Structures are given as structure tokens and as C-alpha cells.
Amino acid sequence: MTLISRCSMTIEETLQIALDAHRGQKDLDGRPALLHPIAVGLMGSNDTEIMTGFLHDVVEDTALTLEDLRGKGVEEDVLAALQLLTHDDGQNYFEYVRGIAESGNITAIHVKTNDLRHNLERGLKTYARAEEQGDTAMMERLARINDKHRKALHLLSCRCGTQSV
């Protein structure tokens, strides 16, 4: 008889953690912050990438810690990727991205790539709305953010041999 091991946590359970953790948060464009991790999760190519995508902003943007997530039953491979994906404010952003690229953790690399692609897509749309409204301050802010995301995506793709946007 062959035993099939069941993951300790389902995609639905990780989505619920993200829903609860991001409740009430808004993004720069005024939309619910949760829409971004959902989009990043849906870009995943396997269950681990989907779960990591759903949770990728939880430690960075909410009160939950990696230990809290471990206590909720999040798998160790997801936690390892989340540790790499959590940016410490004291660390240079591009060093952080370089660390992900050089880690060899395929889940973290794929999720960060998906994160950057989605952030850039959102940023370009929000920039267009700001331009239509004549909001030059928002346009300048978004131009800097979009440029940072382009550079990070390029850095990640060059280090990992993936295709850039």
C-alpha cells in the first residue's frame, strides 16, 4: 500500500490567512491591499508558489511573524521562501533582490518575479490614472517606484537567467 502524504496546509487555508492578515489595508491606488497577494499567488506554477504568493506580504506588511505562520501550520518550504521574500527596511532594496536571486530558492525567485511583474503592471496603470488627473506629485512618486521595479526585475532576471519584462 502506498501512502500519499498530504500537505499540512491547503491553498485555501493560506488564502484565509492572507485575507485575515490584510483585512482593511489599502494599496497606493486605494484598492484593497489583498488584491496584490491574490494576483501574485494566482501567477504561481505549483501549490508551493501559489501559497507563497498569497502570503508573500504578510510578514512584511502585517503583525504576523514567520513563527506565527509556522504555528498556523504553514509548511517549511513556504516559510523558507517567505523568509527570503521579507524585506528588512534596513537592507538596501537591490541587495535584498540580489539575495533572492543568489539564494537558489526557486519558489522565492519565481514569487519575487511575479511580485515585481504585478507591481509594475499596477504601477503603470496607476501612473496613467494620475496622468489623466494631472496629479504630478503622484506621477513622480509612481515613476520612481516603477523604475525601481523595472531595475529589480532586470536584476533578478539577469542573475537567474529568466526573461525580463
Question: Each PLM stretch: what is its role?
Answer:
Residues 2-165:
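Active-site helical microenvironments for divalent-metal-assisted chemistry
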